Amino acid sequence: MWYDYRFRAYPDRTGATAKAERHINIHRQAYNHTRYEYQELDTNNHKVGSAYQHQNRLTEWKDEWSMFSEVHSKALQKTVEQFYNNLSNLSEKKENGHKVGWLKWKSPREYQSMTYSQSGFELKNTSGQTATLWLSTIGDIPIQYHRDIPDNAVIKEVTLKKETTGEWYVTFGLEIEDTELPEKPEANIMNAEDCVGIDLGIQNYVYTSDGDSVDWLDLSDEYERLRREQQSLSRKKRGSNNWERQRKKVAKVKRRMKRKVEDFQHKLSTWLVKKYDAVFVENLNVSGMLQSNGNARNKQDAAWRGFIKMLEYKGDLYGTHIVQVNPRGTTKECAECGVETDKPLWVREHSCPSCGFEADRDLNASYNVLSRSLRELGLGQTESTPAETATAVDPSHRESVPASRVIETGSLGA
């Protein structure tokens, strides 16, 4: 299993900032040159076309441009690999029907990180709140060591990044052997009552098959602050000192919004994997959910992919099954009898014309997610439907949990 730990870094305390910035710029030029050669050189000559082939050209680069000899060789190979990873992601999006262009040339502002892989780094002095990260060709960088890296984790990669706010961060890519992880309960001995289906929606952030719902995180104050700061930025001359100071203010507001969303997602996902043996979620087409104009503003707030990834890696850490199921028809299909009924987005209640079953539309969808996932895990289906076995819930009297409560308490409880 692979996951990340992130720490604040302070290269300025050891005079390493200038060298780190120069090295990142060299990596940026390496990325852009990889892109250039991929477009210009014939892939049939076996010089380019794969990360391995292209990495073999680095010796020629170093002979022609001495700056490439300044940076660590493994880190330079990782930069070439990053281009091909981005290329692969682009191809995957195209295969899935998304409209994609070509990988863009990276400007200095767009490329602000570098990654050491396998070697060229060492974490030292980890006994206190401040540790030291040594990077080959750069030197020592103090980091705010606010949590210990687990003893059973192996550091495979180290990424040094300068944020748009001017702050530096270090991310450790950690690997834990699967044998070190807690065992997930076997499907044939799991109790369906210890499983939950969740619907990721627009009206509520999540709605569980147990009848719990969590409101969207309220970012209205942050959006208003961002609007004011961006308006102030637009009045300043681009590139001036005042413009740069205001740009950092805008970046800090965005960073605060991002952290607030991530904190909410972390606490909600942790609560789910601790409470249940299995969490079932729709494999949503996020762009489809949020493509309408009325929902466009929620795109950066939702970050559904990030939330589902949190569930997946925390499921491994806590021994919880995370299963994604086909979302087709979960809202239309009646959880009681299976008859499908079309509903526009503004209709928030499910009322089946066939059997008369009524529920909140998101609650009905979560029942269907639960039912499909139980079948996928091979648990079979009880004589009763999820709608019949679930705790009786009157949607008109069920209070949705504010996102602020999740942040404050780390749970859906009071």
Where does each model-flagged region fall?
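Gly/serine-rich nucleotide phosphate-binding loop at the start of the catalytic core
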Residues: 1-76
